[in-house]
From Swiss-Prot:
Assigned protein family: Belongs to the ATP-dependent DNA ligase family.
Top-rank EC class of the record's enzyme: ligase
Top-rank lineage group of the source organism: Archaea
Protein's UniProt name: DNA ligase 2
Active-site feature positions: 256
The keyword DNA damage appears for this protein: yes
EC number: 6.5.1.1
Binding-site residues for ATP, renumbered to this chain: 254, 261, 276, 306, 346, 425, 431
Amino acid sequence: MTSFREFAETCQAIEKISSTIDTTSRVADLLKKVDVEELPIATHFIMSEVFPAWSGEQLGIGTSLLYVSLSKASGMPVKSIESLIRTTGDIGDTALLILKEKRKNQVTFSSFFEEQPELSITEVYNRFKIASEASGKGSQDIKIKNLQFLFTSSTPREAKYISRLALEELRIGVGEGVVRDAIAKAFSVPVDVVEHAFMVTNDLGIVAATAKDGGVEALESLGIEINRPIKMMLSQISPDIVADIKEMKEAAIEWKFDGARVQVHKAGDSVMLFSRKLENVTNSLPDLVEIIRKHVKAESAILDGEAVAVDENGRPRAFQEILKRFRRKYDVEEKALGIPIQLNLFDIMYLNGKTLIDLPLIERRKALESCVESSVEDSKSISVDKQVITGDLDLIEKIYKEALDAGHEGVMVKNPNSFYSPGKRGKNWLKKKPLMETLDLVVVGAEWGFGRRANLLGSYTVACYDPKTLRFLQVGKVGTGLTDDQLKELTEILSGLMEGGEAGGIFAIRPKIVLEIAFEEIQKSPNYDSGFALRFPRFIRIRDDKDPEEADTIQRIGKVYSQQLKRL
């Protein structure tokens, strides 16, 4: 078994490295040392994950529970731990200091001759697993007991990274790109083979173990599996849709719906539904399960679509209405009657045992239409999104206006010859919407309001994402556009994500919540670490369907800024 000490030493070394190439080499060195059985664990750990995202497993450990566990392991009162965190700003550094002090005070003559058994990577994983599965009465005690065991069994350096892992934030800047390249380097396989294996498995842990065990041939044999969701292909806003269509010569035009992405997995009568964030939402949408059983005529299939909440006339309801269905855990049938859903399917990635992502869109479209049956009446609940392949700009404008008149967001403009690229955003899928510019940004700070908002978090520091450094870079503060109910909801959510101390009245917030923000323009600014600031930002909605890493990037901020200059 691989010791957790080895993992912690790698993390510590990476923290001191600024070069991506050197970081990749250190990760590759670690992967080479780890036993093949433990590689999935180590691979996810180094990316600040305990479980693969597709699994739906949640660790369920918050800062309060972590403080109690650390208190029990060290003897330091929780309030003292909270005070120390306000100084260090980091749970990992706090755990390191506390356990260093404890070890110093525990040194005795006999302790010099006692050898503490080493924690293994597997032992750490197993303790996290037990904690994650605890539920009901006594579950908090079980979580605390297992965390306490890890802290008392670890060295101070190991405790630093155990505590960060418990919050799934190692803060060492290692993401999927680095690990992909590290797997290629460690096991001497081409990067493009690793990339494709990741696309079809959505699990770099599986990819790493397969690469070590069987090399290129084994990696090339990996494929999509039912009930293991893959990342969804993404679209980007086109700055010049006319030029993009002319470049394609002909484009596949589809309506763009203001709903929630759904990935459908069907095997016989078994149906599972996954959200954009790859959460299993099957139990929340029983009506959709029955619709799919009835109308998808395939023994096995994985489909991509958009679920839209509709009114009695079949027109789309507000985006937040569909999210109410996705979140629902109780009174599901009652909510289904109150908020009916229409499923609009537009792609297929797998059909009857065959992976289709490497086929062009026009071929995938034929496969999709062949396995979905719905009459005009049925189309109120399920349909294949209408598609027109054309280069006629007047016709495209007509379809665009029809989509808006029907209450939808606009149109998708797709390259008919493009493959399905899981998790990728690029020029093969473009969206055209009305001109009001919005950005999806992550909350990284919040401050208490005044007057009527005195007991509410009323202003939020928002940030874009830098995929190169894996950091969130601030672009401004937003406090307008929110209703009282939205303020209460965000206060409840963000209060549980506060970390570190208060600086200038602003509390640091763990980057978990994505907001859609409208703005008048982007300006250059030295006040934020992104180098940019939003002018007149305004809250539009919470994007529960997006992970923080799906927020708009610093590169997109720069591109929007450059486009503004061209319009002057």
